[in-house]
Amino acid sequence: MGTILSWPRHVKDYGGHNTIMDNMMNLELLFWAADNGGNSHLRDIAIKHAETTMKHHFREDGGCYHVAVYDTLDGHFIKGMTHQGYADSSLWARGQSWAIYGYAMVYRYTKEQRFLNFAQKVTDLYLKRLQETSDDWVPIWDMDDPRGKDAPKDASAACVVASALLELQQYADGEKGKIYQKAAEQMLRDLSSDRYQSRDKNVAFLLHSTGHHPAGSEIDASIIYADYYYIEALLRRRSMTP
């Protein structure tokens, strides 16, 4: 197949081997293990997964599918579809955030220009659509939800992207790096505002994330991975020179 199987329980439902965009985040463990005494083949698996995902998991404009399905016998690509997004062809914000973070991370480990170029492509689409569809620097859960700016927000996607941009700005050339850093800082400012801070409302840091909108689950909620990437982004920004 060239990718890691994500959901064995859905092989029959989806009609093949399935890989979700979230899996890009897991490749860091393979790279780290290969670099720290593990089997070097783990690195090959990670690179092959990133290559295959780059080839089949994205539309021409750089927008991603949540799920890619492959034939279980010969491995050919069958279809791209959504699971947690609005539609198969829509721009689900958190899925795109996994792609941005994932390819920035793959470039960190490989230093292969093709991965940096692709990270910037998927990032630039996200930033463009964000400005078209949101009233601030935190996206609506899916940028093609017909409710537009009235759709639920997803702070978790903003946290993932902010952290990724603070890494990506180191690798991007000149003006683009400055654009990425400024965007990340604006995201963190919004996330740190009264609109998104939980304060004494619950034990989380952040409000207004969306987990699985189609299933009616975790809509306008506090989600632990939003807090995780929010803290990671803040730490990355603090480590930079002013």
What is the role of each PLM region?
Residues M1-P242:
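Glycan-recognition and catalytic cores of secretory/periplasmic carbohydrate-active enzymes
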